């Protein structure tokens, strides 16, 4: 099984991979199996590097987890054996029971996290777009100021509201989109664009969905969490 992750900050030099075992939505409620780092990632804007994390569980129960930065081919991995910190049968049964017991609460947490990631991804994507000289130079000064103010306001709110509800994050994203979409559409139309989407490099104006943020979603296998 493979999954693509990315960086969380501009020019992030590496990622810290944490491998968890468990059925819960959040890694804090799961069992940490091991960690490893993937370093020397070339400087790039947040979300640009493509890091493929692959899980391989063999017939003997030995788990191999590898991470590869697709642009450079830089790789690292960890091997986790049955005798290295794995849960016992009783512990696994308890965690499965807990997952069933807290299923509704976990779903609310997971939905809120996905909405938070959606807002964060959209805001940073718009920030990168407005910072692009190819775009910035085509915006009217008043529009550029309005975009920067709306983006900065959304990011400041995010920093102060890390545990808001799904509805609050979705409301904030709609507010941001209500400022960004008309301005970007007007700019595109002034360049002679028609239907069929925005120019390359511009974010989807319909809003971005929940991204591959840390611990996004529950799964039946180990989880990967990235940090700065």
Swiss-Prot record:
Keywords: ATP-binding, Nucleotide-binding, Stress response. The keyword ATP-binding applies. It comes from the Eukaryota. InterPro entries: HSP70_C_sf, HSP70_peptide-bd_sf, Hsp_70_fam. GO terms for molecular function: ATP binding; ATP-dependent protein folding chaperone. Residues 191-200 have a biased composition (Gly residues). Residues 191-228 are annotated as: Disordered. Pfam families: HSP70. SUPFAM superfamilies: Heat shock protein 70kD (HSP70), C-terminal subdomain, Heat shock protein 70kD (HSP70), peptide-binding domain. Belongs to the heat shock protein 70 family. This is Heat shock 70 kDa protein. The gene is HSP70.
């Amino acid at each position: 099984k493979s999954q693509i992750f990315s960086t969380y900050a501009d020019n992030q030099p590496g990622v810290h991979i944490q491998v968890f075992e468990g059925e819960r939505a959040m890694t804090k409620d799961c069992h940490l199996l091991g960690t490893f780092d993937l370093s020397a990632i070339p400087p790039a804007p947040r979300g640009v590097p493509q890091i493929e994390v692959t899980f391989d569980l063999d017939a003997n129960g030995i788990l191999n987890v590898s991470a590869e930065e697709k642009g450079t081919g830089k790789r690292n991995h960890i091997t986790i054996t049955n005798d290295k910190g794995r849960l016992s049968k009783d512990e696994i049964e308890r965690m499965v029971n807990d997952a069933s017991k807290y299923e509704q609460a976990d779903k609310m947490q997971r939905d809120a996290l996905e909405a938070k990631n959606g807002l964060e991804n959209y805001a940073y994507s718009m920030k990168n777009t407005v910072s692009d000289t190819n775009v910035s130079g085509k915006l009217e000064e008043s529009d550029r100021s309005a975009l920067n103010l709306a983006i900065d306001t959304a990011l400041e709110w995010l920093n102060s509201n890390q545990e808001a509800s799904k509805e609050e994050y979705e409301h904030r994203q709609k507010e941001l989109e209500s400022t960004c979409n008309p301005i970007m559409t007007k700019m595109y139309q002034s360049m002679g664009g028609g239907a069929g989407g925005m120019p390359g490099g511009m974010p989807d104006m319909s809003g971005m969905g929940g991204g591959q943020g840390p611990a996004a979603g529950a799964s039946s296998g180990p989880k990967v969490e990235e940090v700065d």
